[in-house]
C-alpha cells in the first residue's frame, strides 16, 4: 500500500527560522529514519506547525537545509482536516469514483478498502459534510495511505477519535513500513508509539530525545528540575546580527 522509505527519510540540518525580530527555531538538526515515529511537543505557537510547513516546502528556512530521501513520498494530515468536498459521500471522496485501487502488483476493491477504515455498508454513502471530526480524520487517513505516503506528517491525529478508531490508528502506525512525524499532546499515544521526542522547550531551544514521552519527561526533570514540567508561556530569543 506504500513505498518503503529509504533509510535516511528526512534530514534537518542547522535550520533556523526568524520572524518579527525573534528566533522561532535556532540551529535545529535531526534525522528521521525508516521505522521511527518522532513526536513534536511543546506549547501552541512554539514552532511545531512551522516545522511541518518547512518539511512540506510551504515555507523556507532562514538558514539551514531540509532534505528528503530519494524514495520519500510525503503524506500530510493537518489539524483542520478541511480539504474535503462536503457534497461527496465517503466512498466517492476516498475512491475518486474508481472501483479498484492498484498498489504495485496488488488490486484492492475500493469498497473493501473504505470498509477497512470502519466505513461499512450505508456509512460509505454518508455525505462528507455530515461527518464528525473523528470520521473526517478517518477519511483523511484513508486518502493519505492510498496515495502511497511513506513519510507521514500527522497534526494531532488522535483528536476527536473514538476508542475503536484510536486503536486502529495506533495499530496501523505500529506496523507502518515507513516513518512518521507527529504533533500531539496525547501522552498515552506518545508513550506507546514514539521512538523519539522533539521538544520545543522555550527560548528558541529544541531538545532531541531518543525514547518515548515518559522517558523524555524524566530526562527533562533531571536536566531542568521539576518546575520545567509545569505549563509555561512560549518565549523566543531576540534575533541578533
Predicted features by range, described:
Residues 1-16:
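ABC-family P-loop ATPase nucleotide-binding domain
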Residues 32, 43-241:
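ABC ATP-binding cassette signature C-motif
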Amino acid at each position: 500500500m506504500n513505498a518503503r522509505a529509504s533509510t535516511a527519510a528526512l534530514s534537518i540540518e542547522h535550520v533556523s527560522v526568524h520572524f518579527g525580530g525573534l528566533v522561532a527555531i535556532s540551529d535545529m538538526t535531526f534525522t528521521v529514519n525508516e521505522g521511527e515515529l518522532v513526536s513534536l511537543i511543546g506549547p501552541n505557537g512554539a514552532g511545531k506547525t512551522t516545522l511541518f510547513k518547512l518539511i512540506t516546502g510551504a515555507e523556507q528556512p532562514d538558514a539551514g537545509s531540509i532534505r528528503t530521501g530519494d524514495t520519500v513520498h510525503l503524506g500530510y494530515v493537518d489539524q483542520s482536516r478541511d480539504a474535503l468536498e462536503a457534497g461527496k459521500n465517503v466512498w466517492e471522496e476516498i475512491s475518486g469514483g474508481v472501483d479498484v485501487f492498484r498498489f504495485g502488483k496488488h488490486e484492492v476493491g475500493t469498497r473493501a478498502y473504505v470498509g477497512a477504515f470502519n466505513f461499512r455498508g450505508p456509512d460509505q454513502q454518508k455525505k462528507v459534510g455530515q461527518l464528525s471530526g473523528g470520521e473526517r480524520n478517518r477519511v483523511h487517513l484513508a486518502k493519505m495511505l492510498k496515495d502511497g505516503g511513506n513519510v507521514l506528517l500527522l497534526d494531532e491525529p488522535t483528536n476527536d477519535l473514538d476508542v475503536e478508531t484510536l486503536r486502529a490508528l495506533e495499530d496501523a502506525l505500529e506496523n507502518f513500513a515507513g516513518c512518521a512525524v507527529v504533533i500531539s499532546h496525547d501522552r498515552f499515544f506518545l508513550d506507546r508509539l514514539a521512538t523519539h521526542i522533539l521538544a520545543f522547550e522555550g527560548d528558541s531551544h529544541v531538545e532531541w530525545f531518543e525514547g518515548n514521552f515518559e522517558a523524555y519527561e524524566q530526562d527533562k526533570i533531571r536536566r531542568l528540575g521539576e518546575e520545567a514540567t509545569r505549563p509555561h508561556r512560549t518565549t523566543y530569543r531576540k534575533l541578533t546580527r
